[in-house]
Amino acid sequence: MGSSKKHRGEKEAAGTTAAAGTGGATEQPPRHREHKKHKHRSGGSGGSGGERRKRSRERGGERGSGRRGAEAEARSSTHGRERSQAEPSERRVKREKRDDGYEAAASSKTSSGDASSLSIEETNKLRAKLGLKPLEVNAIKKEAGTKEEPVTADVINPMALRQREELREKLAAAKEKRLLNQKLGKIKTLGEDDPWLDDTAAWIERSRQLQKEKDLAEKRAKLLEEMDQEFGVSTLVEEEFGQRRQDLYSARDLQGLTVEHAIDSFREGETMILTLKDKGVLQEEEDVLVNVNLVDKERAEKNVELRKKKPDYLPYAEDESVDDLAQQKPRSILSKYDEELEGERPHSFRLEQGGTADGLRERELEEIRAKLRLQAQSLSTVGPRLASEYLTPEEMVTFKKTKRRVKKIRKKEKEVVVRADDLLPLGDQTQDGDFGSRLRGRGRRRVSEVEEEKEPVPQPLPSDDTRVENMDISDEEEGGAPPPGSPQVLEEDEAELELQKQLEKGRRLRQLQQLQQLRDSGEKVVEIVKKLESRQRGWEEDEDPERKGAIVFNATSEFCRTLGEIPTYGLAGNREEQEELMDFERDEERSANGGSESDGEENIGWSTVNLDEEKQQQDFSASSTTILDEEPIVNRGLAAALLLCQNKGLLETTVQKVARVKAPNKSLPSAVYCIEDKMAIDDKYSRREEYRGFTQDFKEKDGYKPDVKIEYVDETGRKLTPKEAFRQLSHRFHGKGSGKMKTERRMKKLDEEALLKKMSSSDTPLGTVALLQEKQKAQKTPYIVLSGSGKSMNANTITK
């Protein structure tokens, strides 16, 4: 402990001085115990010997100071560690402030000896020449430690180093914060205002000061101008600066230059650098401005379009038929090669006055193109749409036709009493009614006109009033043109027309009822008289063929009855009743038309037949058709024989089989007769009237399930598989076939399939079993030798 205190006192006295050895390590004196031991030895051996050994030890210590220093450092490591922990922080700071130059000078002095030593003044002069900080003169320099008083080296403490670094960082952060606060202190915040803004006097003073500064500046400028004019400097300056202004290249020099890009490539507010396009030295072309980035972008877009591999054949492509000047330009046949032959035609525009471009000309050209496109004739038609069940108001306006209403003046006629004899019998006359559906759409609203032979109506007596006699009276049925200036004629209401029709029908019904009552009473009287006469004469009523209500049994009636059982094809949709005719009118028309016209629709049951007409029809059919067809000659070939068999019914085709399955009760073959279906008009109008459009389903086709099977055959008539059919169609479309190897392979495969079909169930495709049997028959053996010969099998064996 005493030694440590002694060393600490020596360090405090030394201050910041230190001595460096030749090996770079400080010398440390030995401990006191070792020193005392050597001293005791030297005292015991003698004075001269001890001094000699002491001197030699000192010289050795000077030579091997490095080695001894390392040993001393190792010996005092533990002691130095304890001492470093007890040192105060102030001494550490002093140690850091030691001058490096002084230590270097001291070390060099110690290592080189007294001969190469410099004084502090000389060292300071030398350091001043080198630009270094001079050494402190007042510092107390202490010589290197001796053996008795060694100098200990400082121990490196990592904790102290870390604390030192943290302290430096804190100091640097505080300094930076101080500088930042100083900089921000000069900036005014939003809440701070200048004092002269609120104070009126300060504001006036500041404005006066600014005005004075302006006046002084103007005076100085005038003074300088006067001095320049006196010495002639102003003219020289103007000439120099004017020449420089003329030499400068400005935007007005860009007028007329061509920019080889589309005007849409430039966006408003975007800065883009344009450079002159590279061209040959001998090319006498105008300068063109381009942008390198836009050129690369256009090239990349073009490469992308080329990679898409669009089809070249576009027969219906609508190209621009006009050029930029709205002139018709010729169309090239192979326009896809124009770019390769003539070169690419880039988009370009010219700069206007001031080096600007607004794209007005391009917009005008686009408007012209749009107008020309609108003038073109369009061949596109309106797409199909569902027919509506009702007419729209617009269609109703076009459908209705206004008629002029004719003013009708009715004359007062004398009342004429109508008797039953005046009415003509309506049952005996024929009516041209519409009993079919061929005129369904056209004559629906037309009431069947009955031609009645009316007695001439007596003309009324001439009136005494000349105005009425000379008046031109027009009727609704007359189609004369109305006089000019007459009011516009309006169409009568449909409801009123319908009411008039119903009233007319009611009137006719009452007349018919009265007439029927009169007829019934007359017929009853006639029947009673005839019955009395027949009883007297003794013959029956049934023999009178013209008597009404009688049934005639003969061959013709039976034939007509049989024909009535055959269904009429094509009249399935003709069961619609006419709306305009009432029930009594239908009965009347059926009785008036007779059986000749009603056979087409109602052939079931009994009906009356006119014998004369039936004979004429039979004669016509007999004369027009032949009973026996001409038979084809068989010896002409196989086709004639097949035709003969088909006509006689010996050969049944697939169509006849299907027909027989569908209609098993059909007695007559389909080849003998045919049914003419002329009901296309009926179907047309019936569908339109019944459903009013094509939105309804086909009810008659509900159970129909089509069975479509498409088959293809080759040249030999063999059915092709889907793959083979596709290959055949593809070859026919492209105009080329398979190669030789594929064709041979396919033919070989077909031959094998043919052999498989021809082979027997008990044999192979090549007939090896049959060949084996033939071989066995020829050799008369139950076996066959596959290799070798039969002689080897029957050879005599060699015996010993």
Curated annotation (Swiss-Prot):
Q: Where in the cell is it found?
A: Nucleus
Provide the positions where the record notes the PTM Phosphothreonine.
T189, T392, T430, T695, T764
- Where on this protein does the Glycyl lysine isopeptide (Lys-Gly) (interchain with G-Cter in SUMO2) crosslink form? 125, 133, 141, 147, 188, 277, 329, 336, 400, 414, 548, 648, 657, 684, 699, 709, 723, 749, 758, 775, 780, 791
Query: What InterPro entries would the database entry show?
Result: HIND, SNU66/SART1
Taxonomically, the superkingdom here is Eukaryota
Name residues in a coiled coil.
157-231, 490-533
A GO molecular function for this record? RNA binding
- Where can the Glycyl lysine isopeptide (Lys-Gly) (interchain with G-Cter in SUMO1) cross-link be found? K141
Summarizing the function annotation, the protein's role is: Plays a role in mRNA splicing as a component of the U4/U6-U5 tri-snRNP, one of the building blocks of the spliceosome. May also bind to DNA.
Identify this protein by name.
U4/U6.U5 tri-snRNP-associated protein 1
Q: Which organism is it from?
A: Homo sapiens (Human)
Query: According to the entry, what is the taxonomic lineage of the organism?
Result: Eukaryota, Metazoa, Chordata, Craniata, Vertebrata
State the gene name recorded for this protein: SART1
